[in-house]
Amino acid sequence: MLRVSVRSLVRKASSKAGSKAAVPAAAAAASAPLSPATSAASARAVPPVGESRVSIPPIPGVAAPRSHRAAAAPAKKAAAPKAAKAKTPAKASRKIKKAASKPSAPKQAAGKMRKAAGKAQRKIKAAARKAAPKKMAKSFGKKGAAKKAHK
């Protein structure tokens, strides 16, 4: 009898006030004396107890509040294999851009296309290895000023 009223009370409380309010309301209903006058409406009128925690056996058909659910281990994502990335300099050089944008020959067989794609990739990687940001040709030091004076 009491279990049925608590179940309905928990459902109503969880839908109205959120899952956190369901536990104190159910505790208040469980502590109320068993009498024919006790119903879900009168039990709801009882103010919920502030801090006291009462352990209630799980009721079938009623979802437990999030705080009482067993913490499920987060599902681990399968680690994707890391592809070898070409070491590119800070700024992409013109060589890399040219190698990447070279148009492939029109309408080739599948094997030739694959071969051409591989060639382009190798060219890009080679260009990335070789290309390093160039240093400034002009030096604004004292030597430069002395050279200008000798001219």
From Swiss-Prot:
Keywords, in A-Z order: DNA-binding, Kinetoplast, Mitochondrion
Subcellular location field: Mitochondrion matrix, Kinetoplast
Record carries keyword Mitochondrion: yes
Residue ranges, compositional bias (Low complexity): 15-49, 70-91, 101-111
Protein origin, superkingdom: Eukaryota
GO MF terms held by the record: DNA binding
Ranges for region Disordered: 13-151
Annotated propeptide span(s): 1-9
Keyword set includes Chloroplast: no
Induction: Present at a constant level throughout the cell cycle.
Listed Basic residues bias regions: 112-151
Gene Ontology CC entries for this record: kinetoplast
Subunit organization: Associates with the kinetoplast DNA network.
Record-stated family: Belongs to the KAP family.
The protein's role, per its UniProt record: Histone H1-like DNA-binding protein involved in the organization and segregation of kinetoplast DNA (kDNA). The mitochondrial DNA of kinetoplastid protozoa consists of about 5,000 minicircles and 20 to 30 maxicircles. These circular DNAs are held together by catenation into a highly organized compact disk structure referred to as a kinetoplast DNA (kDNA) network. Binds preferentially to a specific fragment of minicircle DNA and is able to compact kDNA networks through DNA charge neutralization and condensation.
Official protein name in the record: Kinetoplast-associated protein 1
Upper lineage: Eukaryota, Discoba, Euglenozoa, Kinetoplastea, Metakinetoplastina
